[in-house]
Amino acid sequence: MRYLPLTPEDRAQMLGVIGAPDVDALFADVPAAARNPAIGLAPHAGELEVERELSGLAALNRAAGAGPFFCGAGAYRHHVPATVDHIIQRSEFLTSYTPYQPEIAQGTLQVLFEFQTQVARLTGLDVANASMYDGSTACAEAVMMAQRVTRREKAILSGGLHPHYAATTQTIAHAEGMEIVRQPAAIDAEAAVIEAIDAETACVVVQTPNVFGVVTDVSKIAEAAHAKGALLIVVTTEAVAYGLLKSPGEMGADIAVAEGQSIGNALNYGGPYVGLFACREKFVRNMPGRLCGETVDAEGRRGYVLTLSTREQHIRREKATSNICTNSGLCALAFSIHLSLLGGKGLSQLARVNHARARELKAAVEAAGLEVLTPRFFNEIAVRTKGPAADLVERLLADGVVAGVPFSRLDPGAGLDDVLLLCATETTTSDDIAALKDALAR
């Protein structure tokens, strides 16, 4: 986006056209006391003083890498190569704005085109868009897309879906008249989902690995949904799992959405993240967001442009499929760079390392006398604690161990106060796992 200066002459000309004597006249309807209220800011300070102040505030936090760290539950700590941050800080890329002018944004458009290709290959589906805000909003958009495709109103959310994804979907989709059937939290939710599908169902939303870490082959759910004319939406919160598990497309998914934070992006205090969205080609005109397409110019040279951008800034609001605006383009770039550095074999190896660390974690937890509830897992497990999981987390924190996420923090009303979610990635060491085991034994 280019900067357009506003000179005193320009300002005077505009004021003259509207008949205003000065800029203050534009705000005459605002009470004088409310125009420039005293804010009470601290006195100004130099750069060194500000740096000291902010460093002191930052020191109150505990960095994820400061000790043994086992938190996951939708946000995962992975190693991000220094190359990623170096490339995304190039001036050609350092923006989240939409590349509306293809003649000056070919680099950004090509990167997004490659991003779409990568997402389509990971999910096993035909077409992917140029990213969503995050995984949860992508989930909500997928449900509304299913409403448009099937012209039905009911969406069934599996009990294994991350509670925050379910809540976000309820918040957004209810405004479109959707009936959101949210099933109770369950470690193994496959049978309940299949039983709930009927002729009124627009879509079924399942997550694998689910919020409890359970890996599920959703092929049977796909068959049951399609038999009733419903769509299957598969959610993934840990994108590294694509390197080891069956893709959603292989299992019969019509739409796949995911959180892409695990690849190329840090934890970032919970955001910004990047949503992945893919579907079968026959549904592409109902897909939200933007797509980048490859074309040729008048001289036959290859180029990239925005295409099928059915959002309300581009077409009539009543015809739009979404209102996604300035979004996660920079995070999508980071995702694409990291994945390109890994390659297919590298992603597979990374996924296997994650699974191996999780197996080591499971063995340590069981050796400490706790029950592991997750039968099939990737890099995350659910553990039953002896008492409230939140109390155990606080106790272990005093020992310097960040021992996962109590499920009660995600869904306080689920009645699963004694369930703790633990995650291990390639950043987790054997010493970290030993420290957790020792802390649990005390």
UniProtKB/Swiss-Prot annotation:
Catalytic activity: N(6)-[(R)-lipoyl]-L-lysyl-[glycine-cleavage complex H protein] + glycine + H(+) = N(6)-[(R)-S(8)-aminomethyldihydrolipoyl]-L-lysyl-[glycine-cleavage complex H protein] + CO2
Biological-process GO terms, alphabetical: glycine decarboxylation via glycine cleavage system; nucleoside metabolic process
Family: Belongs to the GcvP family. N-terminal subunit subfamily.
Record GO terms (molecular function): glycine dehydrogenase (decarboxylating) activity
Gene3D superfamilies cross-referenced by the UniProt entry: Aspartate Aminotransferase, domain 1 (3.90.1150.10), Type I PLP-dependent aspartate aminotransferase-like (Major domain) (3.40.640.10)
The protein's role, per its UniProt record: The glycine cleavage system catalyzes the degradation of glycine. The P protein binds the alpha-amino group of glycine through its pyridoxal phosphate cofactor; CO(2) is released and the remaining methylamine moiety is then transferred to the lipoamide cofactor of the H protein.
Keywords of the record: Oxidoreductase
Superkingdom per UniProt: Bacteria
Protein name (record): Probable glycine dehydrogenase (decarboxylating) subunit 1
Quaternary structure, from the entry: The glycine cleavage system is composed of four proteins: P, T, L and H. In this organism, the P 'protein' is a heterodimer of two subunits.
EC code(s) of this entry: 1.4.4.2
